[in-house]
Amino acid sequence: MKIDTGFYSKTITPTYDSDAIDRLRYYFTVFLLTSSAFFIMAKQYVGQSIQCWAPKQFKGGWEEYAESYCLIENTYYVHMNNSNLPGPAIRENKELKYYQWVPFILFGLAVVIYIPRVIWNALQSLIGINISIVTSNLRKVAKSGFTSENPDIEKKKKEMQCKKKATSRQVDGEFWGSRLTTCILATKFLATILIFISMGFLDYFMGLGPMYGWTITKDILQGRQWQESGSFPRVTFCDFQVRELGYVNNWSLQCVLMVNMFNEKLFIALWWWYALLAILSIFDIFRVLFRFTIHHQISFITRILACTGDSAISATEVGEFNRKVLRIDGINLTHLVYANATIFEAADFVRPMWEQFKENQN
């Protein structure tokens, strides 16, 4: 369904074209990821994220060099009950390979979760409608205090009436009125898939196995600290070589990885947040699919039309109005207006089409 948006022609920054769950993904989550990335980056490269216990012969810049090397290269965790350090092969398997890359991974996750938003904006342009402009100008009209007796407003409302040629295309004898709904479902499916992919990537990236957020949370609730579990260890070891007078000396330093204290809290919270987003996103998809039911369509539009002051509303008429004029695209567009404004703005959006429909019926 293609609706004439000439009445809502003033362009503003698009912010009113998504529902609450979309905004949780595309705005709040992106802000959470980017702000966390900047915080961790500042802690790593501006503050002191690692301190190593160096021997006495490390004088001058040696200790600083060792700490910089251990920060850039991987450190590894050894349980304090182990009296000896493991062999080289075992050390490599115990390396912590994530802490240097945390800021970049967070930035990457922010980009990934914003991809459906970019696609949604592109699809709106492709189908020829800007929902943000529709909703925003409805809000402006509501805030301006205009009444229905104002001839200018009546003129503008007539301009936005949904005519048959403007609301649908005929393809092989059938009206095409589900393009907007298809785009909505496609972006929501994509967003949900990307959330699960991001959770799987975090499980792999942290090297703590699947469902690491649940596992670490259970450990914390049971009083099992990082010294026992090895999750996000604060004390690690680092190996490096120093060439002195033609000899290569191997050193193993014990280091305090302070940034892991923040990483633990951040990635546990992030895992649970993504789990919540996954549940909400699945619910969101089923909510859109539920709008295909005739009962919901009639109930929803009847509630919207009740705000127009029309007392003569029958379920049969509303059903015909939905089938012939709004169809599923109109239903979903009205839902988006309602989600970003109020029921009264949604009623202002539907009223001209309803009045035109009743005139045609008579």
Curated annotation (Swiss-Prot):
Protein name as it appears in the record: Innexin-17
Transmembrane segments: 27-47, 101-121, 189-209, 266-286
Keyword annotations from UniProtKB, A to Z: Cell junction, Cell membrane, Gap junction, Ion channel, Ion transport, Membrane, Transmembrane, Transmembrane helix, Transport
Keyword Ligase (UniProt): no
Gene Ontology terms: biological process: monoatomic ion transmembrane transport
Protein family per UniProt: Belongs to the pannexin family.
Gene Ontology MF, one: gap junction hemi-channel activity
Subcellular location(s) per record: Cell membrane; Cell junction, Gap junction
InterPro entries, sorted: Innexin
Main location: membrane
Membrane topology: Multi-pass membrane protein
Gene Ontology annotations for the cellular component aspect, listed alphabetically: gap junction; plasma membrane
Gene name as annotated: inx-17
Function as written in the Swiss-Prot or TrEMBL entry: Structural component of the gap junctions.
PROSITE patterns reported in the protein's UniProt record: PANNEXIN
Superkingdom of source: Eukaryota
